[in-house]
Each structure stands twice: as C-alpha cells, then as structure tokens.
C-alpha cells in the first residue's frame, strides 16, 4: 500500500515539472521500506529523454555527506550535458569566489581543498552563500535538462541538504521536482531540528505534505538515532577525508558527527589507526570545533595532536600545533596567549624552513592585533602591517584577509573619518579594502566596512557622516536580504539616539527586532536591545533600560557567548548596576556590581606594561566598563548615605574617559554636593 501511494506522489510531481512552479512535496509514511525496487523509479531512470531523473536513499546507519545528493547530481549533470570548465560554470552561476576552489577540487578529485581559510565572523554568511550556490547550480542545470529528484528517508539528511531544500522552497523553480520521503517514526538529528521545522511549516502552508497510511503527525513512539550506532568504514583515512569534505563544505555540525563517530571507535572499540592519520584526524576535528565556536574542545584536540608529534620533522608539526592553539586563544579573546602561540608557530616554521607556515604564522600575528575581526566594529588606532605581509597575502591569494586588513587596520582616526564626508578617497586603505571586497563578492564584508565607518563617526560625534554611511549601506545592501535591512534600521536608531532624537528611536529598533525575530538572529536581537537600553538611560527610563539589558544578558548566557559585538559582558553588568541604582533598586545594583567585578578583576589587578603602546582592538582596555563600574559603585555609596567616599572612588578613576567610544553620547551628570 505504501509503495503504491508513494509511486503515485512521484508520478504526480514528475508530470508537473515545467508546468507548475512549486514542485517540492514531502511524503510521510510509518512503515520503513526501500524505494530501490519501485517500478516507477526503474521506469523513469531508463527514460531520460525529457527529464533527468535521480534518486537517493539515506541509511539510518551511515553518515550522510554535505549537500548530499545535490553535489553529485550537479557534477554528473555538468559532465553529461554541459562539459568544459567547471570553474567557468560556477562563475556563470554566481558561486562565491572563496567557494570555487572547494567545488573544483571536489569535482576533479572527490577531495575538497581550500587555501584561504574561513573566518569565524563569516561562518554564517559563507554557509548561506554555499547553499545559494548549490541551489543556483541546480537551477541552471535544469534549464538545460529538467530535473526530478527523489530522496527517501530524508529526515536523516545533513543540515546543509535540508537548508538547500528550504532555499528551493522559498525560491522555487518550475524545472525542478523533488519528492522527500520521510519515515515518520524515526527522528532526524538534533542539529537539524530548527531548519527541519521551518521546512515542515513551509510545506504545510502550501498543503505539500502527504500522509500515507497511518503516518499522521506522530509524537509518541518516535525512535531516535544514536551517533554511536552509525557505521563508518574502518578505512580511517577514507572516513577522515569524508569528515574533512563535510567541513570544507561548511556543514560543521555534520562534520562534528563524523569526527565523534571516529573518536568513539578509537576510544571505546580499540580500533587501530596509524599515527599519521590520527594526527590528521585531530587537526580536522580541531578545525571543525573552532568554526563551531567550541574553542575549549579545539584546544583539547590540539593537545592530543601535540602528543603525537614525531621527533623527525617535529618543527613542522609544532608550528601547526601552535598556529591552531593561537587561533583558539584569539577567538577566546585571550590575545596575549594567542600572540605567544603565534610567535612560537613562527619560530618553529623558520626552523622547518617552511615558507607557507611562516606566512600563516605572520598573518595570525596580524589578525590577533584585531581580535581576528571577531565581534569587533573597529580598532582603537591603526595597526602596523608591513609591506612584506601585504605582498605575501597577494602572492598566496588571501584576498579576503587582505580586504579585512585594508578595512580594519587603517583609517581609524577621527580626523581622517571627518574628512571623508567630502572625499571618501581620503580613506585610502579603507577604499582599497571596500573595492576588493566588492570584487570578490563578499557582501558581508562590504556591510561590515560601512558599519565600521558608521561606528567610528558616531563615537566621534560625527553624526552627519554616520548618516551618510547608513545611506550608502542601505543603497548597497537593499537587494541582499532582510538581515541587512534590519541592521541598517538599527544603525538609524543608534544615530538618532546619538543626536538626542530619543523619541524617534524605538520605531526603528522595534522594526529591526521584528525582522530579526523572523530571521531567527538572536545575537543581533541582543545587540538591538543593548542599544535600546542606552536610549532608555538617556531618557531617564531606567526600569525599561534594565529590562532591555536583561534580554541582552539572557541571550549571552543562553548562547554561551563571551561578548556581543557592541560590548563586553562586563559592560552589560555595569549598565545594569547603574540603571538599577538610578531606579532605586539597591540590592540589584550590588549584585550586578559583583558580577561586573568578576569580569574586570584581570583589568583591576593586572600589572601595567608601560613599554607596550599598541592597542589591540576597541574593547580590550575596558575603559568604559571601568568608568561605569566606578560610577555605579560611587552612586551605591551615595545611596547608602556616604557623602565623601563616592568622590574618592571617582577620583581613583579620573584618568578614564567618560563613555568615550560607542556610548560617548550617553552623558551621566551627577550634581550632588559633598556633605
């Protein structure tokens, strides 16, 4: 019975190809079966005169690859119906510059390779671009030959494959028909739940889910899949390559699953693996963990890697070890440790006489000074970058890194930004970086570049220039999705607040929050609430400020973040303390001050190295937090009836500028007199 109705669904979609726009459906059933022997499958496979027919059946016991089966369909169709250069085909489809090398290597050898590494701040952007690329190539191929795809047991698909289906649902193509078979009594993986729910919701809205037999929406008797039960080949070299391929295609959750399966075999089943493969495994797993933001796990894995370094050629492996460890420390915000690791990586690379490792260690040292461009808006001052490093970046083809350096390392002074109102070319390096970002198609970096200038202008009181770049941002990004429109609305609200037009601000912030909520962007929402809190404090609405700050703080805690892009965690606690005491809540003020101090202890008690003059990035010195902590402490003493201690506390911090960067417009005036 299931086979009959399932075949009927396939027939229906096959006959709709080219005639109707929305040709993606889901067929739910409750008793497992295989589609390999269905008569309709054999018939359509043997008759490809009109439509290219492809089917895939996922296993409950085998790890599904990234973008499976779409990658192989693209490669096969290109070879059969187009031929020639696959790179040229990618360019025609608008595939992102940084992804073409990965796709080319997979097309030619089945093994993915990428020279210029992914930056942590661009992970989500690159994942979206890769999904778009896969979908757009399928659409392009369907213009040459209409395409029918049947995927059985689709609930076992990787996150990247499910994201591709979601993109095709939202951007339908009449020449593509897809039937998704789902065994309703077997649950998919936890990492895919969010996007899976979005697919189901979209298909339900279009009445595109068929329930065969008794397969209604089941909540009981649903079986879960266990990673430990997944089969992998005992040829570990092949398994590690598969995990590496998945990682290079940016499906990090699925790559982590693959690595965990290998790890389980090694630790609990005493499987044998040669040392060379084991070293590679730990490095692939560590890179995957870094790009998932799991730095502690990555450091643990690099330590496992170090224990396997052979005496022969140890300098090469030690350079790789310290490079990876420095990367982890950099993204953790432990910049001094990161710098020491980068230096060790460089020293061992020199001993190994490996020019590539020398270059990577030098580049890491430069990135550390800018916190890896992760969770920052701008740098306090210009970062020195030698001409030699610039030349090496060009030589090695690290164009994305070079664009980041041009944008963030230079043109950070108020005077230069002020002059750009009349002539943007005065921002010489910034303009170079902007042009390079546009050339390689990195829309995220173009947006971030404009945001850097907006933030620099705003914090310097140059609100007209800030608005100029808000407009430029909107003009460039308006066709690139709601996420950027939401961020532009946030920028408008921020600058209106800086100009004292506080009553207009909430409209823009609320519109941004609504868009970001729909897009499921919790970190961005937290940043908007942080900005809302500043506006409330300026208006004297301290209870609303506390509420907004608590939303931001809960997001930080829930997502296990070290900070937001707009501020450190300590600053949120300091503002909570300040808003609490101004609203008369002494108990909460004291509690938040204690939390703030826990984050600031390393600043309060550190030994100042007066020989170091460079600034690493905009939040490293915690000046704002130190002032807010001191000011809130003084106000708490004043509230308790102390009349002289508050002034003593403030004099202790007289060298700290008042909210001198992104909140410089938030003026706190105290008019009390000493008793």
Please state what every model-predicted region is.
Residues 199, 208-228, 232, 578, ...:
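C-terminal non-catalytic interaction modules
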Residues 237, 276-280, 316, 320, ...:
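Residue register of alpha-helical TPR repeats
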Residues 243-255, 287-298, 329-338, 368-383, ...:
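Short coil/turn connectors between adjacent alpha-helices in alpha-solenoid helical repeat scaffolds
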Residues 1-47:
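Walker A/P-loop-proximal flanking segment of P-loop NTPase domains
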Residues 260-270, 303-310, 343-354, 387-395, ...:
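Amphipathic alpha-helical segments of tetratricopeptide repeats
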